Amino acid sequence: GYAVFANGGYLIEPYFISHIEDIEGNLIFKTKLQRKRTTADQVLDTRNVFTMDSLLRNVIQNGTGIRAKSLGRKDLAGKTGTTNDNIDAWFAGFQRRIVAITWVGKDQPGPLGDKETGSKAALPIWIDYMKTALKGIPEDKPLARPEGIKSILIDPKTGLPNDKNGVIEYFYEENAPRTDSGALF
């Protein structure tokens, strides 16, 4: 599911592991990929993709995924997750070329512990994996803002438009908060 956000809105068939090598670099396993497609169907509007990409990047820049900044990249996006009663913890994250999801849970469902959240239990595993997976992959630029998207400074304390203390948030033009009267529509 996250691949469609990572690649700009195109539906592709993901695969889990491309190959496995031993410590000496000998190939142990290689995935037999199906016929390589040269085209893919665009299944999400570019405005949806841009907005979701912005939201998921913010999770890493300022939110529960902030530890991923330790990778030293600005092209990462993701979402932490913790189920009720801390039974499962996960992190789903991506860079344009790689989507990886980590899950922490028990074979027989039961609480992991009060402090075992997606950001504490699953995110560190994702970071360790991505350290290796991203080696040699150049950092991507953010998506270009498509037509029909408006940026507005929103006060993080009130959620209202504010030109002074706001952070940039993106809206469909037809759904953007109005800044002229202070009313939200």
What are these regions (language model features)?
Residues 2-184:
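A penicillin-recognizing enzyme superfamily signal
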